[in-house]
């Protein structure tokens, strides 16, 4: 089978165009190409989109480079005139939406200057730059300037899915056969008896189409809901005089937006104020170099990314008036990138389809030959009647229906169904799967490289200890939870200046007047510490003018700010990783509050304090300052600072993380912590989580960086903790792990984590702490930033794989039995025991209902007690082939005995004996599939009933199948070619079906694999990680 599937191999992430085209062209037997490829990306549309995108980028590039220069030579009078409408005037605005859009799109700084700059423009859109808009104004602003939403492709109606299901070529042929059958039947047998056979086929087709359409429609609704979740972005704005968070879709013209590193610019706008703002415009213009935005170059375009710095912007254009909106409009709903399992099952379906087509043709040929020979031997070869035509038509319908059953169209579609179900469940469990393949690949992950802060820990940080003036003070757990620090007025003032000036966060009042701190958890902890010391954020910010800000980034691991002092000169404050900032200091504030030189003895003493804090699992930060005669023109100095304080921030480990790590280890998944924290803090937290164990290695990023490639490969399997790491270190670790055959999942939250997220097999971005850049490069977004959620994604990834294996085992058994029983019977008796209507019903049990029952089963406990699914493992395992062969042989023997000796065994005689026998065969065949569907719940384990009632879908499908079978046999005989059965015959059919359970138990006792695993799972990996988990 592996050799036959050579053309059906694709990479899980970023598959090559050649591989994608190769497997598409290899799919030769398809009943309904429209439906089969509905969820698969259309390569022609993709190429069309890329061309349109390129055209828009070229247009924007012209605006950036040509129009900027041209505008200097254009007379103001030559610019288009925008007449103010009465509606705009009545709403209180004095500028048109199109004029705002044109100014930003053309980078028209001259027009902005003529209007008086951003301050005067704010007045034209009736907004205060300090207070923001009022929430009550949002509806009128949306009416005048538009909503911040992009044109979406209309949702497909249910009737569209019905129409799509009708495109099945075999169903179309059957419909033609049914219509002809009705015509010929009425002519020969009269009305209404002559209509029964054809009408039965038409009703069966209608049922198949409706069930298929309902299943596909529900799937499409799930994907649409998930797509909406992907587009949700939260932005920070100033409204009603306070800073607050809103959805990107609620943004309106006039909003004052706060931007920081990693944010996506949510609309077109104009720079108000900020520091070192660098914008990545490659998504729009294709330019790789970042653009510096300031008061001289003030225009910001929607869809671009903040690469560095921070700023406030005034929103001027939203929705479809922006260039980003126009680009989004060109996006086509071309489906998802195909997953490896979908491609592989397309291959399996193609191979089986070819076999089925051959059997169908042979069956028709054999039936026709037998019919002609019978006519020849009876001497009526020259006399042909309409009844003979009806018989031949019936043979043709049976042959076509064999193709319906034999071409397992449901195999690749079952993967989509299972993934959609898993994605919906994961969404409710706080994980948003952005790419289908990620859920599937997560089932094969052998290693998770996880951040510490917020993922393993709660991210609810508080300053627990502080060293200042040679004293260590601990937080007092009292009614006010305050620190009792005895500081001189000068030291306290300097400390509070450093806390409140050197921050990217804000202290605001909410609508109820309560104090609220907006910003990262670390910033919130330090600001809360400042408030506990009696500081006032707003007073401090008003006292000093900020001259320059160098925002925190994960490379420098520090943040700095420069403020102007009232008496002249300037003061630089810096805070950051203790070891790094300590090296920048020349002085320290001693016990008397005086600044004294930082001797080697004092450095050792402070280092011991830092180490002591870190060993208690506290994150440590140093707060330092430096006075300057004048503001430097370039970057702030990296030396000559005075140490003020070391703070220890407590960030408790999340409840359940240790158990989640143990679950991973039991499942053969190695967990590695990669953090920017001090190595002592990292080791303490890793031990608490169960990650750092005896025999494991904890290493600093700088040490790892200096290793040769050979040395790296030698120690990487032992690494459990990497501390003080840079984003580049994480990328290098991930890259090397993949080279040694690991399937790597990696978490990230910062902009600089994007390369590692992109490099990993599965990129996991944090939904709360993660930047938009990180989320855009991720495959899965962990909405609650919780490590337990990551483990849940792995659990569902494995469930998808094993569920599809169950479905494939079930479907192939039905394929084999249906094909052989009809073919052999046609060869020997000249008739097929299963009619077209019956085969259509079996096809629905097998395809749509079977997929619903088996492909949507929730994960069981045993899934995380096995090793990861090996990428190279054969999808259809020896164990599955054993089960398929054993069940097929049993069913063929029993049904064959009934077919050839049933009348004598069941003592059937009379005119309806053949009809009764064929009904018993049909009934027994269906109940064989019902019980085999239950068997398929477990490929290897004997107890197939465990957890069966936990899956309501499975229970519902079983109930519906049995109820419909009773209706078909007892009440729809005229259409389904059945007759009502006695209770003895019903009991016999159920008994024959239930014996499948005993056959399954016997089969599962037959060993077929020498290894101690099943179902495509590999042995637990050897090495330090597995031994530790043991």
UniProtKB/Swiss-Prot annotation:
It catalyses: Ca(2+)(in) + ATP + H2O = Ca(2+)(out) + ADP + phosphate + H(+). Residues 19-30 are annotated as: Interaction with calmodulin. It is found in: Vacuole membrane. Pfam families: CaATP_NAI, Cation_ATPase, Cation_ATPase_C, Cation_ATPase_N, E1-E2_ATPase, Hydrolase. Keywords: ATP-binding, Calcium, Calcium transport, Calmodulin-binding, Ion transport, Magnesium, Membrane, Metal-binding, Nucleotide-binding, Phosphoprotein, Translocase, Transmembrane, Transmembrane helix, Transport, Vacuole. The active site is at 451 (4-aspartylphosphate intermediate). PROSITE patterns: ATPASE_E1_E2. The modification Phosphoserine is found at residue 28. Residues 1-157, 218-345, 414-804, 856-875, 933-950, 1005-1030 are cytoplasmic. GO terms for molecular function: ATP binding; ATP hydrolysis activity; calmodulin binding; metal ion binding; P-type calcium transporter activity. It is a multi-pass membrane protein. One of its GO terms (biological process) is monoatomic anion homeostasis. Its main location: membrane. Mg(2+) binds at residues 749, 753. Its EC number is 7.2.2.10. Residues 179-196, 366-395, 824-834, 899-910, 973-982 are lumenal. One of its GO terms (cellular component) is plant-type vacuole membrane. PANTHER family: CALCIUM-TRANSPORTING ATPASE 4, PLASMA MEMBRANE-TYPE, CATION TRANSPORTING ATPASE. Belongs to the cation transport ATPase (P-type) (TC 3.A.3) family. Type IIB subfamily. The N-terminus contains an autoinhibitory calmodulin-binding domain, which binds calmodulin in a calcium-dependent fashion. This magnesium-dependent enzyme catalyzes the hydrolysis of ATP coupled with the translocation of calcium from the cytosol into small vacuoles. NCBIfam families: ATPase-IIB_Ca, ATPase_P-type. This is Calcium-transporting ATPase 4, plasma membrane-type. It comes from Arabidopsis thaliana (Mouse-ear cress). The gene is ACA4.
């Amino acid at each position: 089978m592996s050799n036959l599937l050579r053309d059906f191999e694709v990479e899980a992430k970023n598959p090559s165009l050649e591989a994608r085209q190769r497997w598409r062209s290899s799919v030769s037997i398809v009943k309904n190409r429209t439906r089969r490829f509905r969820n698969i990306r259309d390569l022609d549309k993709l190429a069309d989109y890329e061309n349109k995108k390129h055209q828009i980028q070229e247009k924007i590039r012209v605006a950036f480079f040509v129009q900027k220069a041209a505008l200097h030579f254009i007379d103001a009078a030559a610019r288009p005139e925008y007449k103010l409408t009465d509606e705009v005037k009545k709403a209180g605005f004095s500028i048109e939406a199109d004029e705002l859009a044109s100014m930003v799109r053309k980078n028209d700084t001259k027009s902005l200057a003529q209007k008086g700059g951003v301050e005067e423009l704010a007045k034209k859109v009736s907004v205060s730059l300090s207070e923001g808009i009022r929430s009550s104004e949002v509806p009128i602003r949306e009416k005048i300037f538009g909503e911040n939403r992009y044109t979406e492709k209309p949702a497909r109606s249910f009737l569209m899915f019905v129409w799509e299901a009708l495109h099945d070529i075999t169903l179309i042929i059957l419909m033609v056969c049914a219509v002809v059958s009705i015509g010929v039947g009425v002519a020969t047998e009269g009305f209404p008896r002559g209509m029964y056979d054809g009408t039965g086929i038409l009703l069966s087709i209608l049922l198949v189409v409706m069930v298929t359409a309902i299943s596909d429609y529900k799937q499409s609704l799930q994907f649409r809901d998930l797509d909406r979740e992907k587009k949700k972005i939260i932005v920070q704005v100033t409204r009603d005089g306070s800073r607050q968070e809103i959805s990107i879709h609620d943004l309106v013209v006039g909003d004052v937006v706060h931007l920081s590193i990693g944010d996506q610019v949510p609309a077109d706008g104009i720079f108000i104020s900020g520091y070192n703002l660098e914008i990545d415009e490659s998504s729009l213009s294709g330019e790789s170099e970042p653009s510096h935005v300031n008061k001289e170059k003030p225009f910001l375009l929607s869809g671009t990314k903040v690469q560095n710095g921070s700023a406030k912007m005034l929103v001027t254009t939203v929705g479809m008036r922006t260039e980003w909106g126009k680009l989004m409009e060109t996006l086509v709903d071309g489906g998802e990138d195909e997953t490896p399992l979908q491609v592989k099952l397309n291959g399996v379906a193609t191979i089986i389809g070819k076999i089925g087509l051959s059997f169908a043709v042979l069956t028709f040929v054999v039936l026709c030959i037998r019919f002609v020979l019978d006519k020849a031997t009876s001497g009526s070869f020259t006399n042909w009647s309409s009844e003979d035509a009806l018989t031949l038509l019936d043979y043709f319908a049976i042959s076509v229906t064999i193709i319906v059953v034999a071409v397992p169209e449901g195999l690749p579609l079952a993967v989509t169904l299972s993934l959609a179900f898993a994605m919906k469940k994961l969404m409710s469990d706080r994980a948003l799967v952005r790419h289908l393949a990620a859920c599937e690949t997560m089932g094969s992950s052998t290693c998770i490289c996880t951040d510490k802060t917020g993922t393993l820990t709660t991210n609810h940080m508080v300053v627990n200890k502080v060293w200042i003036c040679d004293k260590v003070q601990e937080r007092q757990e009292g009614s006010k939870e305050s620190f009792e620090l005895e500081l001189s007025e000068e030291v306290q003032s300097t400390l509070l200046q450093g806390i409140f000036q050197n921050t990217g966060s804000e202290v605001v009042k909410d609508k109820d007047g309560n104090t609220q701190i907006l910003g990262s958890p670390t910033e919130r902890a330090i600001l809360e510490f400042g408030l506990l010391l009696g500081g006032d954020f707003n007073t401090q910010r008003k006292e000093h003018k900020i001259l320059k800000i160098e925002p925190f980034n994960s490379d420098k691991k520090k943040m700095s700010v420069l403020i102007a002092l009232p008496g002249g000169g300037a003061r630089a404050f810096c805070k950051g990783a203790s070891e790094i900032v300590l090296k920048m200091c020349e002085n320290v504030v001693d016990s008397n509050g005086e600044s004294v030189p930082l001797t080697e003895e004092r450095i050792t003493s402070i280092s011991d304090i830092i180490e002591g804090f870190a060993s208690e699992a506290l994150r440590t930060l140093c707060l330092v300052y430096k006075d300057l005669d004048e503001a430097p023109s370039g970057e702030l100095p990296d030396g000559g600072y005075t140490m003020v304080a070391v703070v220890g921030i407590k960030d408790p480990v999340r409840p359940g993380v240790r158990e989640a790590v143990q679950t991973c280890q039991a499942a053969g998944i190695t967990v590695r912590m990669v953090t920017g924290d001090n190595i002592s803090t990292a080791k303490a937290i890793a031990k608490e989580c169960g990650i750092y164990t005896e025999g494991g290695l904890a290493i600093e990023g700088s040490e790892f960086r200096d290793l040769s490639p050979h040395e790296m490969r030698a120690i990487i399997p032992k690494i459990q903790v990497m501390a003080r790491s840079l984003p580049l270190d994480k990328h290098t670790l991930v890259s090397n792990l993949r080279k040694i055959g690991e399937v790597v999942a990696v978490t990230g939250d910062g902009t600089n984590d994007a390369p590692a997220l992109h490099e990993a097999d599965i990129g996991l971005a944090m939904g709360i702490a993660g930047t938009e850049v990180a989320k855009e490069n991720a495959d899965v977004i962990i909405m609650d930033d919780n490590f337990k959620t990551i483990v849940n994604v792995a659990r569902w990834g494995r469930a998808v794989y094993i569920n599809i294996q169950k479905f494939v085992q079930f479907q192939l058994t039905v394929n084999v039995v249906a094909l052989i029983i009809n073919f052999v019977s046609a060869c020997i008796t000249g008739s097929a025991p299963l009619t077209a209507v019956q085969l259509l019903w079996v096809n629905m049990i097998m395809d749509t209902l079977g997929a619903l029952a088996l492909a949507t089963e929730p994960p069981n406990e045993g899934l995380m007690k096995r090793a990861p699914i090996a990428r190279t493992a054969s999808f259809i395992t020896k164990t599955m082939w054993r089960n398929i062969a054993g069940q097929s042989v049993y069913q063929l023997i029993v049904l064959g005995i009934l077919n050839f000796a049933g009348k004598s065994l069941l003592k059937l005689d009379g005119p309806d004996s053949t009809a009764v026998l064929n009904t018993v065969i049909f009934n027994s065949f269906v109940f064989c599939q019902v019980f085999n569907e239950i068997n398929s719940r477990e490929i290897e384990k004997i107890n197939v009933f465990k957890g069966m009632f936990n899956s309501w879908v499975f229970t519902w499908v079983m109930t519906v199948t049995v109820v419909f079978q009773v209706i078909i046999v007892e009440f729809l005989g005229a259409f389904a070619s059945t007759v009502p059965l006695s209770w003895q015959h019903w009991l016999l059919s159920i008994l024959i079906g239930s014996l499948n359970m005993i056959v399954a138990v016997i089969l599962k006792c037959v060993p077929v694999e020498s290894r101690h695993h099943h179902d495509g799972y590999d042995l637990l990996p050897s090495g330090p990680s597995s031994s530790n988990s043991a």
